[in-house]
């Protein structure tokens, strides 16, 4: 087992991502609740609403029937170091850390029960 990086620690919950088959309907619903769009919109595949210091994300990239409940996004102090620690524990992420157009660096993995987790940091 590798020695973990001391600077790689969990800092808080960043976002919850939910799936939809109708982005315009979902955006209208959350805007009616007073949620403020910070990325995307009714005609986009991915929309993010600010919720204080966290976010509610909506994705229409379901690739068929919605088979999953969504994703938990957890902020970490250093995405690449945290990724290295995860790999050292024998856990295999879906992909190496990458930069997203919504200004986060992130990677995903699945827990033993099939829940998708994303570890991220704002760029």
PLM region spans:
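Vicinal oxygen chelate
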Residues: 1-9, 12-21, 47-50, 64-123
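N-terminal beta-strand motif that seeds the catalytic metal site of vicinal oxygen chelate
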Residues: 1-27, 70-72, 120-123
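Short secondary-structure boundary/capping segments
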Residues: 6-8, 39, 47-48, 62-65, ...
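Core segments of cupin and vicinal oxygen chelate
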Residues: 10-11, 17-56
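Short beta->alpha transition motifs characteristic of CBS
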Residues: 19, 40, 59-60, 108, ...
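A short linear hydrophobic-aromatic micro-motif
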Residues: 36-37, 57-59, 93-96
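Short, charged/polar, Gly/Pro-enriched secondary-structure boundary elements
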Residues: 54-57, 66, 114-116
